[in-house]
């Protein structure tokens, strides 16, 4: 199962709706023994965009780590402004079973950035 974080919702109800969708998809994937990959927006994960986007990205990363702790194969990819290698890493994380609970950051957006 591959879940792509959408653009930041307009309100908290939108955040709740996205998280509920991610929960249901992840629950089914976990029950079926399918690997889970969340594709996150790097700027949101770093808190460099909207508050609601940051809440959403952080909650999804927490879900990945919880799923992994519960013995599921679950990982995340944080995609920056250039998604050039995203599909490659998504496929790697989805098609393997040795790595779980990890976050792969793509692009240099997180290096040397001060939170603003």
Where are these regions (language model features)?
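Rossmann-like short-chain dehydrogenase/reductase
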Residues: 1-84, 88-96
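C-terminal substrate-recognition "lid" of short-chain dehydrogenase/reductases
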Residues: 83-116
């Amino acid at each position: 199962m591959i879940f792509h974080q959408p653009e930041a919702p307009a309100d908290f109800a939108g955040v709740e709706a996205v998280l509920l969708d991610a929960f249901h998809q992840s629950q089914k994937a976990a029950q079926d023994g399918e690997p889970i990959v969340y594709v996150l927006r790097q700027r949101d994960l770093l808190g460099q965009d909207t508050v609601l986007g940051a809440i959403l990205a952080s909650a999804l990363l927490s879900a990945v780590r919880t799923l992994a702790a519960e013995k599921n194969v679950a990982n995340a990819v944080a995609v920056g402004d250039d998604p050039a290698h995203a599909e490659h890493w998504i496929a790697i994380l989805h098609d393997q079973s040795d790595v779980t609970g990890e976050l792969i950051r793509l692009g240099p957006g997180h290096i040397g950035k001060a939170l603003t």
